[in-house]
Amino acid sequence: MTSGAWLVARPAAIEIAALLFAFTLGYLVKYTINYQSVVSQAIDHYGYGYERTSHEGIGGSNGKIPDCPYSYVISLYGHNHFSPLVDFLHPTLKHKYPKKHSLILDIMDAVHLCLIMVDDICDHSPKRKNHTTAHLLYGSCETANRAYFVLTKVINRAMKEQPVLGIELLRALELILEGQDMSLVWRRDGLRSFESYGEESLLTYKNMALLKTGTLFVLLGRLLNQGGHQSDDLLGRFGWYAQLQNDCKNIYSEEYAFNKGTVAEDLRNRELSFPVVVALNDKHTEPQIRKAFQSQNQGDIKRALQALESPSVKNTCLKTLQEAGQGLENLVAVWGRKEQMHFTK
């Protein structure tokens, strides 16, 4: 190559060298980020490894946790979690029909706790009752599969021992999952998929909650009444109260946030809750909520949380909760959710 040709080609060579350097640097940065992402994904899918994790007060005196996600979640909630409600609604069942009593409690544990296991995966929840969530210990794959496995076993058992209860269980699962599906579609597609406004929007949300949460408590009544409908209204209303209580505590309870490991988890996940729907119907708070749902920027989320804490939104939510609990005082006391909420003066 002549010196003249080299001088002409030199700028191009420099540009190529610069491009190669930039590509190499970009590759290294991308590789590092991808590696970190792969590690994070591995934890999500396969967990931290429960053998290396100990939790004081769980799984025995040696602090080792149970060897399966379902047993772990039971250790957090306690076996036969619905026993106080069952004994309150049907005081003689345990004495008269011990096998049916045992089956009903196992069904309710399976439905409630397996749905919690999957819900925590969907929400990327770090904590449950101030302990690490199951999917972070065992991985999302094993946790979800165990939930399906436990539910399948209890369905099969119910169909063999009490076919009427098995049919009620299947019916309830379909309705619960329909409600959960509505909630997930709203979260996936954002506020554009939630096209209701005003009172209609509150009714739309309530319909979802009655499916997702109300059905759980209606199922308990159906199981206790051998498929009878006589407790549907009472326990459906209680289910709506329980959902409202959970939604409000997600925003207004510091104790609840501590136990969950995050404040306003619903808002951070772009998930609709009753306070969010109320705020969307208030012209003073709607812009902050919509901005947070669109951007997921921490600053926007903070401003949206402040909007949810505004007296107009908070008072509406807590008043609705109080009204929903009228006539349910005994059930509320037996269910025993103790986290305190801070009230607007």
Curated annotation (Swiss-Prot):
Q: What induces it?
A: Expression is down-regulated when the stress-activated mitogen-activated protein kinase (sakA) is deleted.
At the top level, the lineage of the source is Eukaryota
Entry binding sites for substrate: H112, R128, K212, T213, Q243, N250, K260
Q: Which InterPro entries is this protein grouped with?
A: Isoprenoid_synthase_dom_sf (IPR008949), Polyprenyl_synt (IPR000092)
Q: Which cofactor does it need?
A: Mg(2+)
Write out the pathway annotation from the protein's UniProt entry. Secondary metabolite biosynthesis
Q: What class of enzyme is it?
A: transferase
- Which cysteines does the record link by disulfide bonds? none
Annotated Mg(2+) 2 binding lies at D119, D123
Q: Which GO terms describe its biological process?
A: alcohol biosynthetic process; isoprenoid biosynthetic process; mycotoxin biosynthetic process
Q: What is its EC number?
A: 2.5.1.-
Residues annotated as binding Mg(2+) 1 are: D119, D123
For this UniProt record, the keywords arranged alphabetically read as follows: Glycoprotein, Magnesium, Metal-binding, Transferase
Residues of this chain annotated as glycosylated in UniProt: N130
What SUPFAM superfamilies does the record point to? Terpenoid synthases
The free-text note explaining how the cofactor binds reads: Binds 3 Mg(2+) ions per subunit.
A single Gene Ontology molecular function, please?
A: metal ion binding
Q: Do you know which Pfam families this protein is assigned to?
A: polyprenyl_synt
Which family, according to the similarity comment?
Belongs to the FPP/GGPP synthase family.
Function summary: Prenyltransferase; part of the gene cluster that mediates the biosynthesis of lolitrems, indole-diterpene mycotoxins that are potent tremorgens in mammals, and are synthesized by clavicipitaceous fungal endophytes in association with their grass hosts. The geranylgeranyl diphosphate (GGPP) synthase ltmG is proposed to catalyze the first step in lolitrem biosynthesis. LtmG catalyzes a series of iterative condensations of isopentenyl diphosphate (IPP) with dimethylallyl diphosphate (DMAPP), geranyl diphosphate (GPP), and farnesyl diphosphate (FPP), to form GGPP.
What name appears for this protein in its UniProt entry?
Prenyltransferase ltmC
Instruction: Identify the species of origin.
Output: Epichloe festucae var. lolii
